[in-house]
Amino acid sequence: MTIDNQTGLVLEGGGMRGVFTCGVLDYLMDHDIRFPYTIGVSAGACNGLSYMSRQRGRAKYSNIDLLEKYHYIGLKHLLKKRNILDFDLLFTEFPEHILPYDYQAYFDSPERYVMVTTNCLTGEADYFEEKKDKNRVIDIVRASSSLPFVCPIAYVDGIPMLDGGIVDSIPLQ
Protein backbone atom coordinates (compact mmCIF):
# COMPACT_ATOMS: atom_id res chain seq x y z
CA MET A 1 0.00 0.00 0.00
CA THR A 2 1.32 3.43 -0.89
CA ILE A 3 1.23 6.10 1.80
CA ASP A 4 1.94 9.71 0.79
CA ASN A 5 4.99 11.53 2.15
CA GLN A 6 2.84 13.64 4.47
CA THR A 7 1.60 10.65 6.50
CA GLY A 8 3.36 9.33 9.57
CA LEU A 9 2.78 6.72 12.24
CA VAL A 10 2.74 7.76 15.91
CA LEU A 11 3.34 5.04 18.51
CA GLU A 12 2.40 6.16 22.01
CA GLY A 13 3.71 4.74 25.23
CA GLY A 14 1.71 3.40 28.10
CA GLY A 15 3.42 0.24 29.25
CA MET A 16 1.28 -2.79 28.65
CA ARG A 17 -1.13 -0.77 26.49
CA GLY A 18 1.63 -1.36 23.98
CA VAL A 19 0.36 -4.93 23.62
CA PHE A 20 -2.51 -3.58 21.52
CA THR A 21 0.02 -1.69 19.42
CA CYS A 22 1.89 -4.96 18.81
CA GLY A 23 -1.18 -6.40 17.10
CA VAL A 24 -1.69 -3.28 15.00
CA LEU A 25 1.95 -3.32 13.89
CA ASP A 26 1.72 -7.01 12.96
CA TYR A 27 -1.36 -6.21 10.87
CA LEU A 28 0.52 -3.40 9.11
CA MET A 29 3.41 -5.78 8.38
CA ASP A 30 1.03 -8.49 7.13
CA HIS A 31 -0.32 -6.01 4.59
CA ASP A 32 3.06 -4.40 3.80
CA ILE A 33 1.83 -1.01 4.98
CA ARG A 34 4.79 1.28 5.51
CA PHE A 35 5.02 4.89 6.53
CA PRO A 36 7.78 7.27 5.44
CA TYR A 37 8.00 8.54 9.01
CA THR A 38 7.37 6.72 12.30
CA ILE A 39 7.86 8.12 15.78
CA GLY A 40 7.68 6.18 19.04
CA VAL A 41 7.81 6.99 22.72
CA SER A 42 8.40 4.63 25.65
CA ALA A 43 6.70 1.28 24.92
CA GLY A 44 5.89 2.65 21.47
CA ALA A 45 9.60 3.18 20.81
CA CYS A 46 10.32 -0.44 21.77
CA ASN A 47 7.51 -1.84 19.65
CA GLY A 48 8.37 0.44 16.76
CA LEU A 49 11.84 -1.03 16.47
CA SER A 50 10.33 -4.44 15.66
CA TYR A 51 8.04 -2.80 13.09
CA MET A 52 10.95 -0.96 11.47
CA SER A 53 12.98 -4.18 11.16
CA ARG A 54 9.88 -5.99 9.84
CA GLN A 55 10.10 -8.69 12.52
CA ARG A 56 6.47 -9.72 12.65
CA GLY A 57 5.42 -11.10 16.03
CA ARG A 58 8.60 -9.98 17.79
CA ALA A 59 7.01 -7.17 19.81
CA LYS A 60 4.05 -9.34 20.85
CA TYR A 61 6.35 -12.21 21.77
CA SER A 62 8.52 -9.98 23.98
CA ASN A 63 5.53 -8.24 25.59
CA ILE A 64 3.44 -11.34 26.30
CA ASP A 65 5.28 -14.64 25.97
CA LEU A 66 8.64 -13.55 27.35
CA LEU A 67 7.01 -11.57 30.16
CA GLU A 68 5.26 -14.76 31.23
CA LYS A 69 8.49 -16.75 31.00
CA TYR A 70 10.99 -14.26 32.49
CA HIS A 71 8.80 -12.04 34.72
CA TYR A 72 10.89 -9.01 33.79
CA ILE A 73 8.54 -6.47 35.42
CA GLY A 74 7.93 -6.25 39.14
CA LEU A 75 8.82 -5.20 42.64
CA LYS A 76 11.45 -7.93 42.86
CA HIS A 77 13.52 -6.07 40.27
CA LEU A 78 12.84 -2.72 41.90
CA LEU A 79 14.06 -3.95 45.29
CA LYS A 80 17.02 -5.90 43.88
CA LYS A 81 18.25 -3.60 41.10
CA ARG A 82 16.39 -0.32 41.80
CA ASN A 83 14.59 -0.79 38.50
CA ILE A 84 11.03 -2.09 38.09
CA LEU A 85 12.06 -3.55 34.72
CA ASP A 86 14.95 -5.92 34.15
CA PHE A 87 16.68 -3.66 31.62
CA ASP A 88 19.66 -6.02 31.22
CA LEU A 89 17.29 -8.74 30.07
CA LEU A 90 15.15 -6.43 27.92
CA PHE A 91 17.88 -4.46 26.19
CA THR A 92 20.83 -6.87 26.15
CA GLU A 93 19.79 -10.50 26.47
CA PHE A 94 16.59 -10.27 24.40
CA PRO A 95 17.98 -8.47 21.33
CA GLU A 96 21.35 -10.22 21.38
CA HIS A 97 20.47 -13.81 22.36
CA ILE A 98 16.91 -14.72 23.34
CA LEU A 99 14.94 -12.85 20.68
CA PRO A 100 17.56 -11.55 18.22
CA TYR A 101 16.90 -8.12 16.78
CA ASP A 102 17.66 -7.65 13.09
CA TYR A 103 19.70 -4.45 13.29
CA GLN A 104 20.72 -4.72 9.65
CA ALA A 105 17.10 -4.76 8.45
CA TYR A 106 16.45 -1.71 10.64
CA PHE A 107 19.52 0.13 9.38
CA ASP A 108 18.63 -0.70 5.76
CA SER A 109 15.02 0.49 6.11
CA PRO A 110 14.45 3.58 3.95
CA GLU A 111 11.80 4.91 6.33
CA ARG A 112 12.66 7.41 9.06
CA TYR A 113 12.28 6.30 12.67
CA VAL A 114 12.40 8.70 15.61
CA MET A 115 12.44 7.81 19.32
CA VAL A 116 11.49 10.33 22.01
CA THR A 117 13.23 10.83 25.36
CA THR A 118 12.99 13.45 28.09
CA ASN A 119 16.21 15.40 28.56
CA CYS A 120 16.81 15.70 32.32
CA LEU A 121 18.94 18.83 31.89
CA THR A 122 16.45 20.86 29.85
CA GLY A 123 13.16 19.23 30.84
CA GLU A 124 12.26 19.06 27.16
CA ALA A 125 11.74 16.24 24.73
CA ASP A 126 14.66 15.11 22.60
CA TYR A 127 13.99 13.36 19.30
CA PHE A 128 16.55 10.84 18.09
CA GLU A 129 17.10 9.09 14.79
CA GLU A 130 19.84 6.46 14.72
CA LYS A 131 20.46 4.14 11.78
CA LYS A 132 24.16 3.28 12.14
CA ASP A 133 25.16 2.45 15.72
CA LYS A 134 23.32 -0.42 17.44
CA ASN A 135 24.64 0.52 20.88
CA ARG A 136 23.26 4.03 20.48
CA VAL A 137 19.91 2.59 19.33
CA ILE A 138 19.78 0.61 22.59
CA ASP A 139 20.80 3.66 24.65
CA ILE A 140 17.98 5.70 23.08
CA VAL A 141 15.23 3.09 23.43
CA ARG A 142 16.36 2.35 27.00
CA ALA A 143 16.16 6.07 27.82
CA SER A 144 12.76 6.37 26.16
CA SER A 145 11.52 3.61 28.51
CA SER A 146 13.14 4.80 31.76
CA LEU A 147 10.23 5.64 34.03
CA PRO A 148 10.99 8.20 36.75
CA PHE A 149 11.42 6.89 40.32
CA VAL A 150 11.21 3.21 39.32
CA CYS A 151 13.96 3.06 36.68
CA PRO A 152 17.45 4.50 36.71
CA ILE A 153 18.26 7.53 34.63
CA ALA A 154 19.64 6.46 31.26
CA TYR A 155 22.26 8.31 29.25
CA VAL A 156 22.36 9.14 25.57
CA ASP A 157 25.57 10.79 24.41
CA GLY A 158 26.42 11.46 28.08
CA ILE A 159 23.18 13.36 28.71
CA PRO A 160 20.80 12.08 31.41
CA MET A 161 17.45 11.03 29.94
CA LEU A 162 14.15 9.56 31.10
CA ASP A 163 10.96 8.26 29.51
CA GLY A 164 9.89 10.41 26.58
CA GLY A 165 6.28 10.17 27.65
CA ILE A 166 6.93 12.55 30.54
CA VAL A 167 6.88 15.58 28.24
CA ASP A 168 5.63 14.25 24.89
CA SER A 169 3.42 11.22 25.39
CA ILE A 170 1.81 11.46 21.95
CA PRO A 171 4.62 12.82 19.78
CA LEU A 172 3.22 14.57 16.75
CA GLN A 173 6.49 16.21 15.68
Residue ranges and their predicted role:
Residues M1-V41, L49-Q173:
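Patatin-like phospholipase
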